[in-house]
Amino acid sequence: MVAKQKKLSLEEKSREILGILTMVVGFFVLLSLVSHEPTEELSIMPGVHFHNWMGYIGIFISYVLFKMFIGWASLVIAVLIVVWGYTIFAEKDIQPVFRFTGYSFSLSLIGITLFGLIAGQSGMPNDEVFRHAGYLTLNITKLLKDFLGFPGSIMVLGATLIVLVQA
């Protein structure tokens, strides 16, 4: 006997397609970040060999997320895109994913900012901190250090981390 197959409505098909596409984008971003090469810039010149597995689009994604945004903590963004894609595809409850997204992104931002503060304080050159933590993080750490000093910045970030974990 052949089991009857349930016909999917257009809305269900659209949701599944959106979920799959979101997961594909998440994996694309993840592979772009994993294969990030710090020396690759956003120029497309003939004859230049690129190292990013995802080509020129991967270079652009890794440039924006690594160099301009939050460095290695950008990997969390790629994972969150995949999680959102799965949630959409599997028609799971969105509320826990919102909470997970907020916690994950906040923890990664606080963590990379702590890294930037400690690395800068320990004498690591700004270009090295920039290479690992990104431009946004470098500016956040500079702002915190200018207004609060190193100990004050550590205290504020530590308190924020404790409040975040306790919530």
For the regions a protein language model found, what residue spans apply to each?
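Alpha-helical transmembrane segments used as membrane anchors
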Residues: 1-167
